[in-house]
Amino acid sequence: MSFVPYVIEQNSRGERSYDIYSRLLKDRIIFLGEEVTDVSANLVVAQMLFLEAEDPSKDIHFYINSPGGSVSAGFAIYDTMQYIKCDVSTICIGMAASMGAFLLSGGAKGKRLALPNAEIMIHQPSGGARGQETEIRIVAENILKTRNKLNEILAANTGKSVEEISRDTERDNYMTAQEAVAYGLIDSVVEKR
């Protein structure tokens, strides 16, 4: 069972308690600290849309500590980041792996950050299939199509060629925060605000 802390704020009208994530949302901070699933993606997308409706001119700060997860759920978050008017600053804390790294790279240019000891990992998508040969072929073709789409987007986000991305994601490719800057996944490493 996970524990969510509450914070209490006082003002002239009295006290109010918030779960920590709701309180962070007031400061335009969204936190993804789990696997990318349909449920977690829907929460992130809803928060982004809410913050855009509140003030489309202010940045959203998207903190990522995720092992990755579902490609389709990740695309829902990524597409929303590109769709909304707000700049989305991405910040890696801990690890951004797989779809987590993909989302990290999708932040607004110049606003993709990582803390000094963060790790970033990119690789090709994986999946499995059962059934008749025809079904297996359909799934395999879809995985290849998805891989090409991911590679094209990562190439655009990093300044690398699609061929370089394809080669570099053949197997798990771990990077330090500084290596991720050199690779073009992020723009800088930050130690203090």
From Swiss-Prot:
Q: Which residues form the active site?
A: S98, H123
Q: Could you name the domain of life of the organism this protein comes from?
A: Bacteria
Q: Name one GO cellular component term.
A: endopeptidase Clp complex
Keyword Cytoplasm belongs to the record: yes
Keywords for this protein: Cytoplasm, Hydrolase, Protease, Serine protease
UniProt main location, coarse: cytoplasm
Q: Which CDD domains match?
A: S14_ClpP_2 (cd07017)
The EC number(s) attached to this protein equal 3.4.21.92
Q: How does it assemble?
A: Fourteen ClpP subunits assemble into 2 heptameric rings which stack back to back to give a disk-like structure with a central cavity, resembling the structure of eukaryotic proteasomes.
The protein's name in its UniProt record: ATP-dependent Clp protease proteolytic subunit
Species this protein is from: Lachnospira eligens (strain ATCC 27750 / DSM 3376 / VPI C15-48 / C15-B4) (Eubacterium eligens)
Gene field: clpP
